[in-house]
C-alpha cells in the first residue's frame, strides 16, 4: 500500500542539543523509507546541522528543506529582560528557506540572533525579520509560538492581530498557521482558534509534528536525555517532559490525525514544492591576497619562491636542475588549481609571526613535502633531501584544497590570529565550532545519574567498558556501521546487561543516546577565513569568551569552499625559543636552524634513554624503543616517530632486527630497494606506497596518491579495480608477471593501512632533534627553558629538577636578590647552575 503523501516541516535533530535525539543519517533514511519526497530540518535557534542534513538528503535522493525554529523576542532583541514571569522571553517560529535568498536571510537572522540578540536564547525581533523576510516561508509555531501563546491566554483578538502582523511581514502566501496534535489539552483548545484565524485572514493551514525523536519507542530514552540536559532526575515530578507523540510519524498517521483538515496535509507538499534553496559546494571563497602594486599574485609568488630558493640553497639554486624542475612543477600545479592566494596568505602570516619574534614550527602534516613551502619559509625542512613528496600534499590529479597547519609559540598564537583578523576583516575571520558527543562511558554515567543510581553503581558499569579509542557500547558507530563493541569485548559486562534488569534498562537508554551531540565548543586551533563577511556564506555564533565562531564545523566549511587553517599552539616551540635566548647571552650568533643534523652527542643522548624533555620521545615506551633503535641518523628519528603508533608498532621488532643485521633484508622487487632501503625493506611511510606504485606500475605520483587513499580505506570494490590497473601497469612498464605483481600489490596494501605521513614525521622529528641537540649541547639553558614553561605544574617541575640532578646541574634555591620570575642559568665557581624562579613558588 502506497504511503499517504506528506512532508515533515518541523523536525529537530541531535543539533537541537540535548533536546532532539535524531542522527542525521537515520532521519533521512526514515523519511526515504516512508516515501516522503522532501524533508525539513528546523533545529532550535541554530543551523548547526544544515550542511550534514543537506548532503545526506541529496545522497538519498530526497529534497532537503533548510529551516530553523527561531526565537522571536517580545520587543526589541537588544532589550535583555523578560516579562510575564519570563514565559514570553522569546516566542517560537518555524522558518523555511524557499530559495537561495531565503537561505542567505536565514543565515543572517541566525547570525544576528547569536551575535546581537542572545538572552538565554539566540533571539531575533520583528524589525530584523522584516529586513530579512524575502525567500522565507514562516509557520506560526508550536504552543510556544506567539499566536498560540495569545490563544492560550484567552486573547483571541491579540492572536488575530499577531497573525495579521506576520502575514503582512512575510506576505500572505508565505505565512501559514501551524497545526499539531500531540494529545495535549491546550493544543486541542487552541485548534479551533487557529483554524478561525486562518479563515479570517485567508491564511493556509499546515500540519506538523514537532519531531524530536525517530520512533515512539525512543520516547523514554529521549525523556532521559531531557533530564541529562536539565540536570533533573527521571522521578522528579516538576521537571520538563515531552509527550510520546513527538516521533517521526508516517504520512498515513499524520493524515489520520488531520482527517478533518486535508488541506493542512496537502499544504506540506505545496510548501515542499516551493522550496528549492541550494548550497554551493566546492567553489572557492578564499580571500584574494593583494600583492604589491604593479605585481600579479602569480608573479609575486614566483618572485618570493625564487628569492627563497637562493637563500635556502645558495649556488645550488642556479646549478641543480632537479631543484629548478621541482620548483617549476609545484608552481604550475598551484597556478592551475588556483591556490596561489592560499600560499601567499600562509606566507604572509608566517612572515608576520617571524618578524615579531613569534616562534613558528618547522612544518606540520604533508605541507613539509612542498619545495615552494620550504622556499617561502612556511616549512623548514628540505623536501628533496628527505625524499618528501609534493603529491602527498597537493595532488594534481585530484583538485582538493591544500591543508597547511601551522604550529606557533603557545603564548603568542593569539597575536597571529589577531593579525589575520585585522588584515582580512574581523567579520571575515572566525574560529570553528566543534560538538562534544555522549561517549560510551560518559553516557552510562549520565543515564545512571538520571535513573537515580549512585555514582559507584553507574561507575561499576562504566568501568567495564574497555579503554579503547572510539569504543562504542554495541559496536555501532554514528553512521550505523557494525564492529565489535564493549558488550562483545567484556563477558562481565555482557553478563550484567543480560542478568541485571536495572542494568539492562540503563544499557537500553544509553545505547539509543550514545554518540549524540550534547554540547558545542570551539576547535582548539581551527580558524576560517573568507573573502568577505562570513555571514554572507555561513551562520555564526559566539563562544563563551565573546569570540566569533562558525555554526558549521570543520568538514562542512571545507566542503563549502571556505579557507580553513589550523593555528596550533605548541609549548615546545616556546621552550626552544626561551633556551635559544638564554644561549644568546654567551653565544650571540647561535641559530637553531643551522645546527648540524648529524650531531653524535644528540644521538648518544637518545640511545642512552636520557630523553626527558625531548619532544615526542620522552614517554617510557618511546624512550625504550629509541634505545633499541640505536639512532645513528636523523632519518632514524623520522622512522621512530612514524612506527611508534598503534598498528605499525607491530613492525618495530622486525625493523630493529633488520637494522641490526639479525634478519635479512629482502625486497619483493629490485625496484623497491631504492624506495625502502632507508627503512630496511619495510614500508613505513605513505609516500613509499606512492613511490612504489609509480616505479613498478607507471602511476603518476598523483594517481599513486589516489591508490594509497583507496588502500587505506579498505574499499573492496575500488581495490579490485585498482589491482587490475596495478597488475596491468607492472606488466606494461616492467614486464612483471601477474603472480608477482599481485603479491607486490598485497604487500603494498598491507602496509598502506598503517603507513604514516613521512612529511609530518620528518617535520616533528626535526623538533625532536632540536630539543635533543639543545639538551645534549646546551643542557643548562635547555633545562631552564623547560622549567620556565612549567611554572604552574609542580609535578613537571619535580621531574625536571630530578633530571637536572642526574645531569649534574645544581638547582639553586629562590633568592629575593638573585631570582627572577622564571628559571635562569647562573654561573658558579665550579660550573653552571639554574636559579629557581619566584613564579614557581606556591602562592607567590
Residue spans of the language-model regions?
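Alpha-helical scaffold/interaction cores of sigma-54-like transcription cofactors
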Residues: 1-844
Amino acid at each position: 500500500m502506497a504511503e499517504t503523501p506528506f512532508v515533515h516541516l518541523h523536525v529537530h535533530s541531535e543539533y537541537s542539543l540535548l533536546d532532539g535525539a535524531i542522527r542525521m543519517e537515520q532521519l533521512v533514511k526514515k523519511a526515504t523509507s516512508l516515501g516522503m519526497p522532501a524533508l525539513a530540518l528546523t533545529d532550535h535557534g541554530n543551523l548547526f546541522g544544515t550542511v550534514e542534513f543537506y548532503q545526506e538528503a541529496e545522497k538519498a535522493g530526497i529534497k532537503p528543506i533548510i529551516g530553523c525554529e527561531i526565537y522571536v523576542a517580545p520587543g526589541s532583541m537588544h532589550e535583555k529582560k523578560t516579562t510575564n514571569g519570563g514565559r514570553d522571553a522569546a516566542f517560537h517560529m518555524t522558518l523555511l528557506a524557499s530559495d537561495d535568498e531565503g537561505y542567505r536571510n536565514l543565515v543572517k537572522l541566525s547570525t544576528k540572533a547569536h551575535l546581537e540578540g542572545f538572552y538565554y536564547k539566540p533571539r531575533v525581533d520583528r524589525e530584523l525579520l522584516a529586513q530579512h523576510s524575502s525567500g522565507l516561508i514562516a509557520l506560526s509555531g508550536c504552543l510556544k509560538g506567539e499566536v498560540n501563546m495569545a490563544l492560550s491566554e484567552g486573547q483571541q483578538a491579540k492572536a488575530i492581530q499577531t497573525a495579521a502582523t506576520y502575514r503582512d511581514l512575510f506576505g500572505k502566501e508565505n505565512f501559514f498557521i501551524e497545526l499539531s496534535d500531540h494529545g495535549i489539552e491546550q493544543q486541542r483548545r487552541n485548534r479551533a482558534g487557529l483554524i478561525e484565524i486562518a479563515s479570517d485572514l485567508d491564511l493556509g493551514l499546515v500540519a506538523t509534528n514537532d519531531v524530536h525523536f525517530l520512533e515512539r519507542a525512543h520516547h523514554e530514552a529521549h525523556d532521559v536525555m531531557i533530564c541529562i540536559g536539565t540536570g533533573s532526575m527521571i522521578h522528579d515530578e516538576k521537571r520538563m517532559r515531552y509527550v510520546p507523540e513527538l516521533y517521526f510519524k508516517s504520512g498515513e498517521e499524520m493524515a489520520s490525525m488531520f482527517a478533518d483538515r486535508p488541506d493542512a496535509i496537502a499544504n506540506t507538499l505545496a510548501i515542499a514544492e516551493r522550496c528549492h534553496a541550494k548550497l554551493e559546494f566546492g567553489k572557492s571563497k578564499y580571500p584574494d591576497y593583494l600583492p604589491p602594486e604593479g605585481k600579479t599574485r602569480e608573479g609575486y609568488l614566483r618572485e618570493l619562491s625564487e628569492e627563497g630558493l637562493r637563500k635556502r640553497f645558495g649556488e645550488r639554486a642556479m646549478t641543480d636542475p632537479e631543484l629548478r624542475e621541482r620548483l617549476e612543477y609545484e608552481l604550475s600545479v598551484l597556478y592551475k588549481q588556483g591556490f596561489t592566494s592560499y600560499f601567499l596568505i600562509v606566507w604572509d602570516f608566517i612572515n608576520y609571526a617571524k618578524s615579531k619574534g613569534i616562534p613558528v614550527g618547522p612544518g606540520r602534516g604533508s605541507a613539509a613535502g612542498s619545495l615552494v613551502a620550504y622556499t617561502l619559509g612556511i616549512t623548514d625542512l628540505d623536501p628533496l633531501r628527505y625524499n618528501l613528496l609534493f603529491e602527498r600534499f597537493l595532488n594534481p590529479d585530484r583538485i582538493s584544497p591544500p591543508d597547511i597547519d601551522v604550529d606557533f609559540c603557545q603564548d603568542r598564537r593569539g597575536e597571529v590570529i589577531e593579525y589575520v583578523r585585522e588584515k582580512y576583516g574581523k567579520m571575515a575571520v572566525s574560529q570553528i565550532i566543534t560538538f562534544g558527543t555522549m561517549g560510551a562511558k560518559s553516557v552510562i554515567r549520565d543515564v545512571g545519574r538520571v535513573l537515580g543510581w549512585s555514582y559507584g553503581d553507574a561507575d561499576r558499569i562504566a568501568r567495564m567498558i574497555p579503554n579503547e579509542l572510539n569504543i562504542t557500547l554495541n559496536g555501532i558507530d554514528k553512521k550505523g556501521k557494525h564492529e565489535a563493541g564493549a558488550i562483545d569485548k567484556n563477558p562481565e559486562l555482557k553478563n550484567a546487561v543480560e542478568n541485571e534488569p536495572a542494568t539492562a534498562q540503563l544499557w537500553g537508554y544509553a545505547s539509543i543516546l550514545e554518540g549524540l551531540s550534547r554540547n558545542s565548543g570551539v576547535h582548539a586551533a581551527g580558524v576560517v577565513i573568507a573573502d568577505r563577511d562570513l555571514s554572507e556564506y555561513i551562520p555564526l555564533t559566539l563562544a563563551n569568551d565573546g569570540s566569533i565562531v562558525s555554526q558549521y564545523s570543520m568538514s562542512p566549511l571545507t566542503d563549502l569552499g571556505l579557507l580553513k587553517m589550523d593555528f596550533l599552539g605548541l609549548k615546545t616551540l616556546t621552550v626552544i625559543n626561551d633556551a635559544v635566548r638564554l644561549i644568546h647571552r654567551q653565544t650571540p650568533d647561535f641559530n637553531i636552524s643551522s645546527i648540524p643534523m648529524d650531531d653524535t652527542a644528540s644521538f648518544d643522548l637518545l640511545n642512552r634513554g636520557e630523553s626527558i624533555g625531548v619532544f615526542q620521545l620522552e614517554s617510557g615506551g618511546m624512550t625504550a624503543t629509541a634505545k633499541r633503535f640505536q639512532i645513528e641518523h636523523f632519518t632514524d628519528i623520522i622512522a621512530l616517530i612514524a612506527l611508534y603508533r598503534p598498528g605499525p608498532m607491530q613492525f618495530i621488532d622486525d625493523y630493529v632486527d633488520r637494522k641490526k643485521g639479525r634478519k635479512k633484508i629482502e625486497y619483493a622487487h629490485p625496484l623497491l630497494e631504492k624506495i625502502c632501503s632507508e627503512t630496511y625493506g619495510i614500508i613505513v611511510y605513505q609516500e613509499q606506497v606512492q613511490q612504489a606504485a609509480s616505479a613498478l606500475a607507471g602511476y603518476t605520483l598523483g594517481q599513486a596518491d589516489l591508490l594509497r587513499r583507496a588502500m587505506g580505506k579498505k574499499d573492496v570494490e575500488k581495490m579490485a579495480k585498482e589491482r587490475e590497473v596495478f597488475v596491468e601497469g607492472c606488466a606494461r612498464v616492467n614486464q612483471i608477471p601477474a603472480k608477482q605483481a599481485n603479491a607486490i600489490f598485497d604487500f603494498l596494501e598491507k602496509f598502506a593501512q598503517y603507513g604514516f605521513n613521512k612529511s609530518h614525521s620528518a617535520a616533528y622529528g626535526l623538533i625532536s632533534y632540536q630539543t635533543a641537540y639543545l639538551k645534549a649541547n646546551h643542557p643548562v639553558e635547555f633545562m631552564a627553558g623547560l622549567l620556565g614553561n612549567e611554572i604552574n605544574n609542580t609535578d613537571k617541575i619535580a621531574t625536571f629538577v630530578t633530571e637536572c640532578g642526574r645531569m649534574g646541574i645544581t638547582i639553586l634555591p629562590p633568592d629575593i636578590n638573585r631570582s627572577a620570575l622564571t628559571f635562569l642559568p647562573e654561573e658558579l665557581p665550579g660550573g653552571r647552575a639554574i636559579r629557581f624562579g619566584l613564579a614557581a613558588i606556591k602562592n607567590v
